[in-house]
């Protein structure tokens, strides 16, 4: 499976669910993570499309067929209207994404992916580009889609295929 195929299979549906969830807007407003919700929703989307998606096989968040997917939510410390200003350890969040990539690389899955939601942020934010680069250097390729939670809080969802020939 390619990153484009997984992106096409999941991202429109998950973005619709994010944008229509008043509960997630509360999370975004407080910069709170929602990985458990994301896991349930991704499995629901895949199951409705005929995939036998399961949670926590070999400690991997979501898997089906030969595909393993790790999920993360990355709450940033960048100031935005409608979002509480708090200190968030973005470096630790990025390290957590890369740890999940490292865990997945050592599995038997043929196709290994990371899907992560970053918020509040826009894809072209200069501060974010540095942090994103620390993740994407571990990816063969990736796609993204920018969206807004209700309340005009910006977020970006990324879907990347993990490079198997990393140094």
Feature annotation, model-predicted:
Residues 113-167:
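Domain-level recognition of nuclease-like catalytic cores that cleave nucleotide substrates
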Residues 21-29, 108-124:
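Short glycine-rich, basic-tinged beta-strand/loop micro-motifs
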Residues 1-56:
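Acidic-basic catalytic patches of nuclease active cores, encompassing PD-(D/E)XK
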Residues 25-31, 78-93:
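Surface-exposed cleft-lining segments at the edges of enzyme active sites
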Residues 10, 14, 18, 42, ...:
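Hydrophobic, Leu/Ile/Phe/Ala-enriched alpha-helical segments that form helix-helix packing faces
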Residues 48-70:
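Hydrophobic/aromatic-rich structural module bridging two neighboring secondary-structure elements via a short loop
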Residues 62-87, 104:
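Conserved catalytic cores of phosphodiester-cleaving nucleases, focusing on short active-site segments
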Residues 85-114, 124-127:
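Short, charged, amphipathic alpha-helix that recurs within catalytic cores of restriction-modification
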